[in-house]
């Protein structure tokens, strides 16, 4: 099926679903129920009020209003904040409630509930299957896989389980997946109920309530809400199985099964069509077709970039290097290998050593660096610093290595060897606000060039935070103010999800396919400067970035004291490899001229004009543009042009006797309409157009 037909098919499905929702909403607005008697009032989101008697459940309320609502609702929200199941009893006597019914199509909370429930079906089916196979497993994790920033997309959520084989040589095979799916389908048809069981346990200090979900003969310890019964899962599939990193040495490697499910076959069909479109844009396919990169089992997770892929990679770095020059960053080069003592000082050895490649040399333990920040702290600390040197913005494109499990490796999006557009800013506390603002402006500039939209999220103090509470509160207040100045109220708070060393701003970008990615991050770090004893001298009332509305975090600044700087971690691409993967899928391999590895190709109409074609190629090449020439005499001219078009050359230059005589080139532009692709240009005019394309990022 063609890309266009797939897109039209999905649009028809979406239009059909939207029409159904509109008809239901229209019915609600014209229907009223007025039960007589005592009880309480139920107010809906649209403002209508209904009176109900006795004890009610959201399901009985919904069915009395409209049975379609009762059928489609998965959860309900009581009084604007409390999520309850459709079967939970509401005491109506003398009380009024606001209630909202949540369906799968429109509400992320409902989808999360649905996929959590689906994970229990998968867990039960998997345990039943391996029990019959006499293989011992342990269920470690289960639930939904929904990024908070992708939760608004019906087609970007899944469910999963992680299991541990007692026999570590065991793995999940395709045949196992097929049989587990059949058991799931049987469980769904049987329409088993999900039951919430609660055990009250008296603790010495407090009452603790543990929740269990009983499903068939199995009990699952968890407190998430579920659907009422399994037959609400109309359509399901298992789409992936792989190994993932376990939580500790005892469970060092787990086996993960990922599935997808929907309450209607139409939604599943829609999802399948979208996967077909995604397959056409898969960066692994584009990378192979355009000869950009490949992987080899002799070095798993480490990419081999071919010449054309390297051109894109270097252009991305060149783009950032030019911006660094404009924005006051200094590029540095730091070592790849560090003594274990560095990682003990930074705290990574206790928390991250399992993700590091380590080895022994001269009876000393060393590791390949997985991040640049500790090395940059050494750079800051190698001599005394004054407040006059701050802010110090240093950037590093050094190679990083992280020991990802083999099963988690996936194209360029999850690798072991990569480079980050990593930068660290050392500044005084009262510079934080201005530096964060500049980082956000930088991010917006970059993402606008790539035609990404984005959403900002402030992650605040976690329970495991280190440092003074007052420092955290002032930092979070400062970041909140900057975000509000930057984008008004179009940002969200992710409570308790900050790093232990400081709050952070996560940036979630959306590509042309509607897929969300977290690449950029801006993090405050109060702990590494303490661990590495970083200091600067002086600073009272001497900073150009003072803001009367921004309190200083460090109140001990004076000209004779040594003060602690704040460290800001900043990345825009995340890893260059991952950004390349996103851009491949975002552009579907149709690179804009400024990034393109195939900017131009020269094709002679016959071998008689090969020399002239080579002369044109040489001039374009020496002018600094990526140009090829096709001198293959065994191919017809039409085939050469067709192959160049499929290969996504931005410009195709065809030369023959007329071009020699007139010194005017016959140029075909990829991005012009089909009936207007060919133009006549002199070589100088062509260079002017190339230069303009690069300046305007076209």
UniProtKB/Swiss-Prot annotation:
- Name its cellular compartments: Cytoplasm
KW Chloroplast (keyword) present: no
Pfam families to which the protein is assigned, alphabetical: HGTP_anticodon, tRNA-synt_2b
Q: Which GO terms describe its cellular component?
A: mitochondrion
Checking InterPro entries in the record gives: aa-tRNA-synt_IIb, aa-tRNA-synth_II, aa-tRNA-synth_II/BPL/LPL, Anticodon-bd, Anticodon-bd_dom_sf, Beta-grasp_dom_sf, TGS, Thr-tRNA-ligase_IIa
One term of GO molecular function: ATP binding
Q: Where is this region: Disordered?
A: 541-560
Per UniProt, residues of the TGS domain are: 38-100
Xref: CDD domains: TGS_ThrRS, ThrRS_anticodon, ThrRS_core
Enzyme class, UniProt record, top EC level: ligase
Catalytic reaction(s) noted: tRNA(Thr) + L-threonine + ATP = L-threonyl-tRNA(Thr) + AMP + diphosphate + H(+)
Q: What is its EC number?
A: 6.1.1.3
Q: Work out whether the entry's keyword set contains Protein biosynthesis.
A: yes
Q: Which PROSITE patterns does this entry report, sorted A to Z? A: AA_TRNA_LIGASE_II, TGS
Q: Which UniProt keywords apply?
A: Aminoacyl-tRNA synthetase, ATP-binding, Cytoplasm, Ligase, Nucleotide-binding, Protein biosynthesis
Please cite one Gene Ontology biological process associated with this protein. Answer: threonyl-tRNA aminoacylation
Family of the protein in this entry: Belongs to the class-II aminoacyl-tRNA synthetase family.
Q: What is this protein called?
A: Probable threonine--tRNA ligase 2, cytoplasmic
Natural source organism: Dictyostelium discoideum
């Amino acid at each position: 099926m063609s890309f266009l037909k797939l897109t039209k098919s999905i649009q028809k499905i979406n239009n059909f679903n939207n029409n159904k929702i509109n008809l239901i909403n229209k019915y609600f607005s014209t229907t009223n129920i007025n039960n007589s008697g005592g009880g309480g009032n139920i107010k809906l989101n649209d403002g209508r009020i209904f009176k109900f008697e006795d004890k009610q459940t959201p399901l009985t309320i919904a069915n009395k209003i409209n049975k379609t609502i009762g059928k489609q609702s998965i959860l309900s929200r009581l009084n604007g904040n409390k999520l309850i199941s459709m079967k939970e009893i509401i005491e109506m006597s003398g009380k009024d409630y606001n209630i909202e019914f949540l369906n799968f199509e429109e509400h992320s909370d409902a989808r999360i509930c649905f996929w959590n429930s689906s994970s229990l079906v998968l867990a039960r089916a998997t345990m039943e299957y391996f029990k019959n196979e006499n293989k011992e497993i342990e269920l470690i994790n289960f639930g939904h896989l929904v990024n908070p920033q992708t939760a608004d997309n019906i087609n970007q959520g899944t469910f999963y389980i992680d299991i541990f084989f007692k026999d570590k040589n065991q793995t999940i095979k395709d045949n196992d997946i097929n049989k587990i799916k059949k058991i799931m389908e049987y469980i769904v048809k049987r329409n088993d109920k999900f039951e919430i069981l609660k055990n009250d346990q008296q603790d010495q200090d407090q009452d603790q309530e543990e929740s269990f979900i009983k499903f068939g003969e199995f009990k699952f310890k968890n407190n998430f809400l579920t659907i009422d019964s399994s037959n609400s899962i109309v359509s399901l599939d298992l789409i992936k199985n792989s190994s993932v990193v376990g939580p500790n040495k005892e469970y060092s490697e787990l086996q993960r099964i990922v599935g997808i499910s929907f309450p209607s076959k139409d939604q599943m069909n829609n999802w399948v069509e979208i996967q077909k479109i995604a397959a056409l844009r898969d960066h692994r396919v584009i990378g192979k077709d355009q000869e950009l990169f490949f992987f080899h089992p002799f070095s798993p997770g480490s990419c081999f970039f071919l010449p054309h892929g390297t051109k894109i990679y270097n252009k991305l770095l060149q783009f950032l290097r030019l911006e660094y020059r404009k924005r006051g960053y200094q590029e540095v080069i730091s070592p790849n290998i560090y003594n274990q003592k560095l990682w003990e000082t930074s705290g990574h050895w206790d928390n991250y050593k399992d993700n590091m490649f380590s080895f022994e040399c001269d009876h000393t333990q060393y590791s390949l660096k997985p991040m640049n920040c500790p090395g940059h702290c050494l750079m800051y600390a190698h001599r005394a610093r004054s407040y006059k040197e701050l802010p110090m913005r240093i950037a590093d494109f050094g190679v990083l290595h992280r020991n990802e499990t083999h099963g988690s490796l996936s194209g360029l999006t999850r690798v072991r060897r990569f480079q980050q557009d990593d930068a660290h800013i050392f500044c005084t506390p009262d510079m934080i606000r201005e530096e964060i603002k500049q980082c956000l402006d930088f991010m917006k500039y970059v993402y606008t060039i790539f035609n990404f939209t984005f959403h900002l999220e402030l992650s605040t103090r976690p329970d495991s935070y280190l440092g003074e509470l007052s420092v955290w509160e002032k930092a979070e207040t400062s970041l909140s103010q900057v975000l509000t100045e930057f984008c008004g109220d179009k940002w969200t708070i992710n409570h308790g999800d900050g790093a232990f060393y400081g709050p952070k701003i996560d940036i979630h970008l959306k590509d042309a396919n509607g897929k969300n990615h977290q690449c950029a991050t801006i993090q405050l770090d109060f702990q590494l400067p303490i661990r590495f004893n970083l200091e600067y001298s002086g600073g009272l009332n001497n900073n150009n970035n003072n803001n009367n509305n921004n309190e200083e975090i460090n109140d001990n600044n004076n000209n004779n004291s040594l003060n602690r700087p704040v460290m800001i971690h900043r990345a825009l691409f995340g890893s260059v490899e991952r950004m390349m993967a996103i851009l491949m899928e975002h552009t579907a391999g149709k690179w804009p001229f400024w990034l393109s590895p195939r900017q131009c190709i020269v094709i002679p109409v016959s071998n008689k004009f090969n020399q002239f074609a080579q002369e044109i190629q040489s001039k374009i090449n020496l002018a600094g543009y990526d140009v090829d020439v096709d001198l293959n005499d065994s191919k017809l001219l039409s085939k050469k042009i067709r192959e160049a078009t499929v290969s996504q050359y931005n410009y195709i230059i065809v030369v023959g006797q007329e071009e020699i005589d007139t010194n005017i080139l016959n140029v075909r532009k990829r991005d012009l309409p089909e009936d207007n692709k060919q133009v006549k240009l002199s070589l100088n005019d062509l260079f002017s157009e190339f230069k303009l394309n690069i300046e305007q990022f076209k």
